[in-house]
């Protein structure tokens, strides 16, 4: 019995020594891609062996999901995606794979990196817990309005966001959480924009949106004809004026672009992020 155990241990150690470590080669990428395209995903240890790769199953899984899978989206997370991550994390915590299911083309690793290098680090800079009510207040008061403003800038020049009302009055604007609809769209579909009341102020109704309660303060919303509307006063420009904070100015010489790309830096100073770069967030510090 003891000899048998020793042989198994020796065989396993020999296998481990043969496994490749370090960066993947083009040849390995090609082998893995061709195998999965012909046979599909499966048990990753089996995939590694059948594809002729001297890699662990875990290494193959991460390589495929994070780099080789054809439908992976590259580049910066959009404001819509950032808003959705904030909302879903408030519901599910660090369940990155589950959150990734609602962001087509984004990987759980990318979402986790965004949370750790942007959100958690900002909470640490404020000296508060990232899952605390105080931090959610900061998110609701400063980050969410700027994300909504960025969404507005990316779509068209509008002054009011609206979405169909459901049972929750306290909510963020979020893409519909229907798996079918989300899997079909790369970004939120804005084709359903229309005016609400026909007045001179422009209103924008986002199609394929739902409401999920958490961040948005009800006092900042109005219900018009069964719709949830977020008005111009609640959506401030980056580097601009924040209602009730007249004594504080945003540092305007910071770039307005929010770079949330593949190359996250653990040493990046997120206080320079225009989403947060407002002097009046001092009130949220401990």
Swiss-Prot record:
Induction summary: Slightly induced by salicylic acid. Induced reversibly in response to phosphate (Pi) deficiency but repressed in the presence of Pi, specifically in the leaves. Availability of Pi increases with decreased levels.
Domain (HTH myb-type) ranges: 16-68, 69-123
SUPFAM superfamilies: Homeodomain-like
Chain's role: Transcription repressor of phosphate (Pi) starvation-induced genes. Negatively regulates Pi starvation responses via the repression of gibberellic acid (GA) biosynthesis and signaling. Modulates root architecture, phosphatase activity, and Pi uptake and accumulation.
One GO cellular component, as annotated: nucleus
Full protein name: Transcription factor MYB62
Record's subcellular location: Nucleus
One BP term from GO: root morphogenesis
Domain of life: Eukaryota
Major subcellular site: nucleus
Molecular functions per Gene Ontology: DNA-binding transcription factor activity; sequence-specific DNA binding
């Amino acid at each position: 019995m003891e000899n048998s155990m020793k042989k198994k241990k020796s065989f396993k150690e020999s296998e481990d020594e043969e496994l490749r470590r370090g960066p993947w080669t083009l040849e390995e990428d090609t082998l893995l891609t061709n195998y999965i395209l012909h046979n599909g995903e499966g048990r990753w240890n089996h995939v590694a062996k059948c594809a002729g790769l001297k890699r662990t199953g875990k290494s193959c899984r991460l390589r495929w999901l994070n780099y080789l899978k054809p439908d992976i989206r590259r580049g910066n997370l959009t404001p819509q995606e950032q808003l959705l991550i904030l909302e879903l994390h408030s519901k599910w915590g660090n369940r990155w794979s589950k959150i990734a299911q609602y962001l087509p083309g984004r990987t759980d690793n990318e979402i986790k990196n965004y949370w750790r290098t942007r959100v958690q680090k900002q909470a640490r800079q404020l000296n508060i817990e990232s899952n605390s009510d105080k931090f959610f207040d900061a998110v609701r008061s400063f980050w969410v309005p700027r994300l909504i403003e960025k969404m507005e800038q990316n779509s068209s020049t509008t002054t009011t966001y609206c979405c169909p009302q459901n049972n929750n009055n306290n909510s963020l604007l979020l893409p519909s959480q229907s798996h079918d609809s989300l899997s079909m769209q790369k970004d939120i579909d804005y084709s359903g924009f229309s005016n609400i009341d026909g007045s001179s102020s422009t209103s924008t109704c986002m199609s394929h949106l739902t409401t999920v309660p958490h961040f948005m303060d009800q006092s900042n919303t109005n219900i018009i004809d069964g719709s949830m509307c977020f008005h111009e006063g609640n959506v401030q420009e980056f580097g601009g004026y924040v209602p009730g904070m007249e004594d504080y100015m945003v540092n305007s010489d910071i770039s307005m672009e929010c770079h949330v790309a593949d190359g996250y830096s653990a040493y990046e100073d997120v206080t320079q992020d225009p989403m947060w770069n407002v002097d009046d967030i001092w009130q949220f510090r401990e």
